[in-house]
A protein has these predicted regions:
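Phosphate/nucleotide-binding beta-alpha loop and adjacent structural elements of enzyme active sites
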Residues: 2-6, 19-304
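Alpha-helical transmembrane segments of integral membrane proteins
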Residues: 9-13
Length: 304
């Protein structure tokens, strides 16, 4: 009887070891795949920036466009700003929206566009980041608010870890977290969690207050999982950006966002890191240029 028990225990331990080892191998493969994706994204970003700087210099030398008023700093994480510059062929008077603008500079997609002469609407819910953004971006309208679906008004609560130590706590302080997750992040990284209330509105309501005079060229949506709600609040049947750059950590699996954009005749052209670039499918020339850049121009790889 004792021998049988030893055999059973040995079999169970062997099975547990096999399952654990298989999970470890799967995790290693996923981490290796993520590392390759990050390396590919960094390489694409480098190619895009080299292409854009060379193109900008050539245009300025030939007189096609005037020299830039100041050196242009491309700050985005995956070269999104450089691609937008190329996509709009160095346009100097565009209009953008950035929902989730953070401090206005860190990994900003629209900072370079404002440096070129664009203006826009920047929205940031966290009070400290809003103040930094307002100071850093004098050429645009900066609004302190959280964004929701159409008809949103009043205030909403945020659970905010006040960063004590570590980048994760600081990052968590910039985004909207559930109370449980906020407490977990705060506790894990030495931060105290507090609840704050911030103004709640929609993008369409903000645009109604100061409508863009010549349409919306670009809308950047980086709202940590609330993309579908914020897009609903933009009211795409009224305010229709030519290009949408939308963070999607599900990499296309979020049917709510995807279906809403397809229903409004947008086509996803390329992935830049975890950001999908969507172009108005009714704008034939812009869509064709975006596909050209994705297929063999400034960017190689990452097509939808």
């Amino acid at each position: 009887m004792l021998l049988i028990e030893y055999i059973l225990i040995g079999s169970v331990l062997a099975a547990l070891w096999f399952v654990t080892e298989r999970r470890h191998r799967r995790t290693r493969r996923r981490l290796q795949a993520l590392e390759r994706r990050l390396q590919d994204s960094a390489a694409r970003t480098d190619r895009v920036e080299r292409h854009v700087y060379a193109d900008l210099a050539a245009r300025a030398r030939s007189g096609v466009i005037p020299p830039a008023p100041a050196p242009i700093r491309f700050l985005s994480q995956f070269g999104e700003d450089a691609l937008l510059f190329d996509l709009f062929e160095g346009k100097r008077d565009g209009f953008f929206i950035e929902a989730g603008a953070y401090d206005g500079t860190s990994l900003s997609t629209t900072f370079a566009l404002e440096s070129l002469g664009w203006s826009g609407l920047l929205v940031e819910p966290m009070p400290g980041r809003f103040a930094q953004c307002r100071d850093a971006r004098p050429g645009s309208r900066v609004v302190h608010a959280a964004l929701g679906p159409r008809g949103s008004r009043g205030t909403t609560a945020f659970e905010v870890p006040e960063a004590a130590e570590g980048a994760m706590a600081d990052l968590a302080a910039s985004i909207r977290l559930s109370p449980a997750l906020a407490r977990q992040v705060g506790g894990d990284h030495g931060a105290v969690v507090r609840s704050i209330r911030v103004p709640l509105t929609s993008l369409a309501a903000l645009l109604n207050q100061a409508p863009p005079t010549s349409g919306i060229d670009v809308a950047v949506i980086d709202v940590e999982g609330f993309e579908a709600q914020v897009l609903d609040g933009l009211e795409l049947d009224r305010y229709r950006p030519r290009v949408l750059l939308i963070e999607d950590l599900t990499h296309g699996q979020d049917a709510r966002t995807r279906d809403l954009l397809v229903r409004h005749s947008y086509e996803r052209v390329v992935w830049l890191g975890h950001n999908g670039l969507w172009v108005d499918a009714r704008d034939d020339a812009l869509l064709a240029r975006a596909k050209m850049l994705a297929d063999g121009g400034a960017i190689r790889g990452g097509r939808s």
